[in-house]
Design a protein with these regions (language model features):
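Extracytoplasmic thiol/disulfide redox context detector
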Residues: 1-56, 126-129, 133-134, 166-172
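Structural microenvironment flanking redox-active thiols in thiol-disulfide oxidoreductases
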Residues: 40-71, 75-103
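Solvent-exposed loop/turn segments at secondary-structure junctions
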Residues: 23-26, 53-57, 84-88, 121, ...
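Alpha-helix N-cap/helix-start motif
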Residues: 27, 57-58, 91-94, 125, ...
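C-terminal cap of thioredoxin/glutaredoxin-like
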Residues: 104-172
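A structure-centric signal for secondary-structure junctions around beta-strands
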Residues: 11-13, 61, 139-140
Length: 172
């Protein structure tokens, strides 16, 4: 249980937050499991992702994540970033590398520049920085259930998440 639980919406939903990093091999391996799990979750589960922001490369990757969300291309580009980093061994560690990546996947430089360094994306990255500290994220992937419970990625992580989701649902 978290020392300082996060406030969650009181809309009858149980929030599940996955904290990840594109460059993490464990996060990449867990991605297909998370996708499959998310397809089977009840309607009262609200699933979200948040990039970890420990250092400058993590913050750049967080800006990529929020840019991808802003242009509405999560379904295609999220997997493409993971693939580029893990299959092509291109860590995308500079803004120039990120720009080249987006160009290769068909995002125009004008669309990219509209979002990557925008106020909205910067604000979301800053919020991720705050939450990374507040939640004391020391490894990824990590899953937070309803702002209260921290689940480290292990083989049984999603079963643990299911248990906690049901427990939280019965408490609401």
């Amino acid at each position: 249980m978290l020392e300082n639980p996060l406030p969650t919406k009181q809309d009858g939903k149980v929030e599940v937050l996955e904290i990840f990093w594109y460059g993490c091999g464990h996060c990449y391996a867990m991605e297909s499991k998370i996708k499959a799990w998310n397809k089977t979750t009840p309607e009262y589960v609200s699933f979200k992702k948040m990039p970890v922001t420990w250092g400058s490369v993590h913050r750049l990757h967080a800006a990529m994540f929020y840019t991808i969300e802003s242009i509405g291309a999560e379904r295609d580009l999220h997997a493409a970033v993971f693939s580029t980093m893990h299959n092509e061994r291109n860590i995308l560690s500079s803004e120039q590398a990120v720009t080249r990546f987006f160009g290769k996947v068909g995002v125009s430089s004008s669309d990219l520049s509209k979002y990557l360094n925008s106020f909205g994306v910067k604000q979301r990255v800053n919020r991720a920085v705050e939450l990374t500290k507040q939640l004391r994220v020391d490894s990824v992937p990590m899953i937070i259930v309803d702002g209260k419970y921290k689940v480290a990625a292990r083989d049984t992580a999603l079963q643990t998440v299911d248990y906690l989701v049901e427990m939280q649902k019965s408490e609401s």
